[in-house]
From Swiss-Prot:
NADP(+) binds at residue 38. NAD(+) binds at residues 10-15, 97-99, 123-126. The gene is dapB. SUPFAM superfamilies: Glyceraldehyde-3-phosphate dehydrogenase-like, C-terminal domain, NAD(P)-binding Rossmann-fold domains. Transmembrane segments: none annotated. Pfam families: DapB_C, DapB_N. It comes from Dehalococcoides mccartyi (strain CBDB1). The active site is at 153 (proton donor/acceptor), 157 (proton donor). This is 4-hydroxy-tetrahydrodipicolinate reductase.
Length: 263
């Protein structure tokens, strides 16, 4: 199998570095370029010490120079949207792990995939355990009508609620087919989190955390808690590799890693 050539956008960030390290360990993937707004030199040393790859803040230049099969994006929505447009114009498939997009931006990303005849996967979470957590929450939502979501992340995460929390809530509501039980009236506005059709969502941002979420269901005499904890960014890499592998054979827009797992 010819290795899949990959450019990483947001390469100097923590997720970008983890992606590059993982790609270097795999025979079927080949990192060929790195892009980051903080780039100050024309080359970036690979994490495994095997050499260096072209490095620039100019995405279009890197894509023209390296001719990748896939661009992996882990940045912020404000930086990601212009990069997605550029990559799509270059006919480069995309794996997007950035969150915080508006519904209008997601619609634009879907249209870019169609217009440019490329594959784009946008996934709020690449941890396989987190995907299974959402799936189990969907199952429970068919039977239990009171639920709350608590998501906890590191203090550098900009968006709240997290993309995973929003996807979890949407999936639960879809599975249930109606609103959950409305919680009692609160005396202090937003003291019990943000309400989504009866589901309260609570966001915690603290140093020392990475990415954690629990979905708590309650019924008379019982509770059910479904929880996922990410302690290291390594947990996202199997999902990222799966997305890269599949997107080169996929046309159009895919939202969520669960579609590739066929859950």
């Amino acid at each position: 199998m010819t290795p899949i050539k990959v450019v990483v956008h947001g390469a100097s960030g923590k997720m970008g570095q983890e992606v590059l390290k993982t790609l270097c360990q795999e025979n079927n993937f080949h990192p060929v370029g790195a892009v980051d707004i903080r780039a100050e030199s024309p080359a970036m040393a690979l994490p495994d010490g095997s050499g260096s790859i072209p490095y620039s803040a100019d995405l279009s230049s890197i894509l023209s120079q390296t001719k990748p099969d896939v661009m992996v994006d882990f940045t912020v929505a404000k930086a990601s949207m212009p990069a997605i447009r550029i990559a799509a114009a270059h006919k480069v498939n995309l794996v997007i792990g950035t969150t915080g997009f508006s519904p209008e931006e997601i619609s634009e990303i879907e249209q870019l995939a169609k217009t440019n005849d490329i594959g784009i996967i946008l996934a709020p979470n690449f941890a396989l355990g987190a995907i299974i957590m959402v799936h189990l929450a969907q199952v429970a939502s068919r039977f239990l009508s009171s639920a709350e979501v608590i998501e906890l992340h590191h203090d550098k995460k900009l968006d709240s609620p997290s993309g995973t929390a929003l996807v979890t809530v949407a999936s639960m509501l879809e599975a249930r087919g109606e609103a959950f039980n409305k919680p009692p009236k609160e005396n202090l506005t937003d003291a019990r989190g943000q309400e989504h059709d009866g589901i309260r969502v609570h966001s915690v941002r603290l140093p020392g955390l990475l990415a954690h979420q629990e979905v708590i269901f309650g019924a008379a005499g019982q509770t059910l808690t479904i929880r996922h904890d990410a302690f290291s960014r390594e947990c996202y890499m199997p999902g990222v590799l799966l997305a890269i592998k599949e997107i080169v054979h996929t046309k159009g827009f895919v939202f969520g890693l669960d579609k590739l797992l066929k859950l």
